[in-house]
């Protein structure tokens, strides 16, 4: 896990890439790579690559980056891991065409794989990655993001050059980079708690979508291509029995966990006590000579909105004989963390779970662990959220042949009753407009509520009529390519394309890297995802219980009481904390923000605060703090 940065100057520009220019951007990301740093600049000063190193695989100086091949025609700056690099290296060694300068660097495998197979080498990579590769012979720059979007990559095209980095804050060190809010990204943030790729909250800065590459030529032409989509790989398992599918799932997940143990530094597991992290822990412990190291977070005191899961984490740790570590957090620590949080986020990631993710990452580092496996992805692949069951029922109702005129009459009645901010109104509106009920596994504000929340003058700057516009390309692809266009498959696919890569995985990446720790995600190995999306809906949800199939697959692997207890999820008791210092800080910050800017309607903001809408208020606070740190400075 590292930090990537660089620039490529087009033929119509006189700009020159210099060492101070690259180092200034690179060293905003020291936390991503505290173990070393490097810079390479082409002789004509038209191309530059920089790198911050967190040493994990092949710790030798020979594996430092940016790395060039033997004749200097290919150079790469790489963030992430290629878990199957040893197998690919053997294939390349058999050709006899390549000289190797490292013992087992996956970075060098990328260089020689590209030389051998071109960009099609991505088909062979199994891992999480974001990299920039310069092809000197063709004068082409390649920017690549992994299939699921575990690793980020941002870029900006301005003043005759493209500048790119693992973090936005690096791009902002370019003296010609503007700092302005993207109006439509802001509008979509209020729905999705994040911004949909390729947008970021910064006007003029883009992020590479998951499973996508860019090819940039010195003329300034940019070609974008989606090289992976799950519907190109999922093959329906219609003839397989439920038992056979369960066996395949566990075998695939066992392989995924095993691949993510490959490291030259200590590896541990984040353990919440839920099914996903407990399954990771059980599989990780198999074949280990020593105890697996596990890390958990809880909260001081009792909270109605979030109950500590430490009992279950300890229960799982004891079963596998883990070396278990845990820490209790409180509201004062969250308040103190807010400035660091928004700086690490780069753009608002409106999820208070950023706080415990950072703290558990720091706990692992303090105990000598550099890499941890995490449980993201299982809920989306196996219907793990209570809201999903409700949404599936609502979608079935929406599909009934009820005339649209009757649905619109219902909307009018709800408006007259002052209920147009409610989820019920939004669900009915989507049904009347022919939109799917489900947009995302996490939604902040309805379309009608956003119209009240956003200040009138700022609304005029927003061209989008609805945040459905951000999802329409995803829906078109689903309708064209999905082998089974069930409601459940749509929900999973929508979250694979937006919520996972741009919200859940970014909170993990930004916060873990803020503590200089690498996070690996076994449930989102692309082979496992392809298998999960090949399972018929009737088998995946069985009798209708949440995570029906996964629960049956892991019985005997983890304690029964962990499997059968109600779903809770990894959270933060912000509702209660808003009644103390956090609430005072929030009222003051949002009052100041509303008076200084024209983004929100102040009356609507304080209506939410007075109503105790803690989580929604958090989304607004996150944006206000980010704006002050990144835009108003």
Task: Go through each PLM region and give its residues.
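Short low-complexity, flexible loop/linker segments enriched in glycine and/or proline
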Residues: 339-343, 366, 387-390, 577-579
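Gly/Ser/Thr-rich phosphate-binding loop
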Residues: 373, 413-417
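Short, conserved alpha-helical segments within structured domains
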Residues: 105-109, 276, 330-334, 356, ...
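A mobile, often basic/glycine-rich helix-loop segment
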Residues: 380-408
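Cysteine-centered catalytic environments shared across enzyme families
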Residues: 1-345, 357, 361, 555-562, ...
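Adenosyl-5′-phosphate
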Residues: 1-4, 10, 24, 43, ...
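Short, flexible loop segments at the rims of nucleotide/cofactor-binding pockets, characterized by
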Residues: 347-353
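Short acidic/histidine-rich active-site segments
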Residues: 369-379, 383-385
